[in-house]
Amino acid sequence: VNNLDDNATYEVRVTATNHLGTSEMSKSYIASTTSVTPPSMQEYKLINRPTSENEIGTTHIVDVRNKKDENGWASQDDYLHYDSKYALVDGDFTTEWKVDNWDTGASYGADRGSEITFDDTYTIGSIGIGRTLQSGHYMGLYKVKVTYWDENDNKNVVYTESINEKWSNGNSYYMVKLNEPIRAKKIKVDTSGYGGSTQIISELKFYEYDTLSDDIKNLYEDDLRLVLKKSVTQDVLNELAKRLDTPDPISGEYHPDKDVLKKELDTAQKLFDDKEVSEKITTLDASIRTNNEGPSLGMGNSYQSLGSVARPSVDDKGTSKQIVVYMGSSDPNTRVDIVFLQNYGLPGSYMSKVQTVSPGRTEITIPSIISADVEKGGQVMARVTQGSTTANVQIRLSGVTEIPNLNVNNMINDTTKEKEVKDKIRNYISELKTYMNDINTLYPSEVSDKDKINNVYLYDEQTSPLNTTDIEGDRFTLTLPASEILKGIESGLEGNTEAQVNRVYDALLAWEQEVKVGFAKKGVFEEVQDFNGNGEIDDEDRAYFRKHRAPLTRLNIKYQRMMMGAAAYASNHHIGVGFSSSQYIQGVPYKFDENGKVTNADSAHLYGGLIGHEMGHVMDIGDRLYPETSNNLMTAITGTMLNENSPYFDSFKKVYEKVTSNTIGLSTDRTVVLNMLWQPYLAYEDNITYEMLFTDVDADLTNDSYFAKLNRAYREMSEEERVNGDRDQWLIRLSSKVVGKNLTDFYEAHGIIANETTLAYVSKFPKETKKIQYINDEARRQRIAGTADMEEVTTLSASFANGITTGSYVDSKEVKINLSVDKSNDRILGYEIYRNGEPCGFIERDKVNSQTVYTDTVENINNRVVEYKAVAYDYNLNPTNEVQLG
């Protein structure tokens, strides 16, 4: 129903008519219209201005020919509809030209665009496309095809994807920039949108080409506008400034990009006055991609910092603030995704939609990502998605606030660049201190509720987007509060710049090492090598590398809002941490001499159990996922780099209770299950943990760590290995395969029973006869040190305590047994106790007293005979003689 008044209420009744007649009126329904205000589109250099002086409705257009008109080029097109012959250019946003399809002819040969004839030949540089004012219609414009005829009626076709969506009065419209200006007497516009879209156009607006923007661009010798041409003089700059300050004589509007062009011209003036002045330029690493050949390891973040923060706002005209992205590349096929982050974001709301830019200049509206009553805004990030991985890609931004940014990518691990890296760190620390001293001046001293609506807030250390910094290495990015990073740098080292530089240098290397440990654990490689040992890198090596290639992305540690008391969380994009993050710039890597020995055992430390826990989540295997458990293997590894007790060592008492309980099913205690996953490593890994940093990344696959081999086995799992399996069965099969032993007894002790398929699979391996369910970190250390084996014919002695004798009646629920050996006491791990032929307990040796006392609590066996047996095990799990007690 057309021509209804705005903000009016109507009573609606309907009837239906068919070949049988017309029905009665329906019930009455009340419906109200809303006020629809069309967008205020640019009028600067507009050719077809609204007018009431002709039939068409706009100036300088003399004819429109539509596809389905009497004089059109087709009588049938079920997708095409238009309200009137002149709907596209009648100056009325309530009339529409509609195609019920995503393409009007820009991608395929539908040829639906209308031919619009001007009264003269015009040089056109851009086109405005007004969308339908109806809600619920998605246009998703991404490509425009322009067919035009010049003054000699020569037909030409051009395409463009330089499309900028703008918003005004609650409605969006598109401004389409042609790659080159065209001279047109007649023009035809076709569009393509993304899948699921419909192309509904209210108005087409044509704009004469204005050379001002290109004239300013042509001041420079390079696309990034860093070097002025030698022909630039002050008179040239003055003339451009005068033109920029001259409004369109008809509309009275200034150039729509006046503010941006003024900044560009101001930059040119500064460069003219001082040849050393320049704006910040960021060089992107084009090799950091998400389309990795190997496993992603859950690290999906390929974004790189542009060292800037953008904050959304709206001006007095209702126009949203934009940034301008200038991107140049040695490869014209380069494509870069631009996103905005929200500082102090929520786990599900921290990043904007992607805007893809090509080499050149792109305007992007700054989005509001969250609705919370805090300042909106955050870092602007970029990632290279297409083009050569060796391309020189550079980006410059305008409309942003620069923040301290330390980028040592492709440098931090190169020892020959240590001085260069430390110089960058020194400059960064100086910049960071100055920035934090001045940060309050970037904020007002008071704000109103109205100010907050337009995203103007007081400075708040925990929520203000400007209190942030980015630090980038080869394998990591820190996106953390600038105040906390400065605190971490200065703490205990106030006034000692060189010590602060060294602290940061070590901290960055510690992050690199943390990720390297993760890569070693996962058994991935960063470069192809001669894995098959035939003396050359061949197709077999390359195929193996592709299957086990380390991700090219980086681990991102990002300051986020924590929910429900969480200390941190993991996602594909980042590990979210809370505000207190100064410790993340204080790690110290394990340093090695020429023989691969640790030289700083007393000071080395990575980033602790919390980061290990979350990294474990990021990198965990879907086929071997034990929730909130298997991820902690990363914590165990980083906590035992020097073969210390793992952070879960104190849980072995519970492990021993489980493996001697004779119960089916895994323990409900996660630390017990974790130690079940840890024990094969303890049993079969003879290298010091840190050695995986060397053994797991070279071409020799035979000396790799247990976890590297196991993770590769999961990635290589065959259909035979997968059949009739689940998480537990695959664990039995693949861990047995990796160690070359049948481990069914070990897993059965932990409550996992092998099925028939698993039993058949592991039957090819010899049975593991040692009871590795009793091994702990200390036993592994003793084995590696060569002090695990007891002397031959070490004899166990066992007897009842408290005067109990064999065959006597015991009126107590507790039975105590004294245990000792006649020699090699310091090599005894512990004692296994049997009750009536079944294991009922395992106790570690008492390291203080000569005897170890085991207490068995006996329940519900009144008036029954109980027989005991005891066996001692050394640290290498060799048993002593058995002693019977009854």
Q: Predicted segment positions?
A:
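Disordered, acidic Ser/Thr/Pro-rich linker "stalks" and the adjacent N-terminal cap
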Residues: V36-D120, T132-M139, L240-K242
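Aromatic, loop-rich ligand-recognition surfaces of beta-strand-rich domains
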Residues: D6, D90-K155, G170-D214
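Beta/coil-rich, acidic/histidine-enriched accessory regions frequently appended to metallopeptidases
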Residues: D274-L297, V324, R727-Q851, I861-N878, ...
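Extracellular fibronectin type III
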Residues: H19-V36, L877-G886
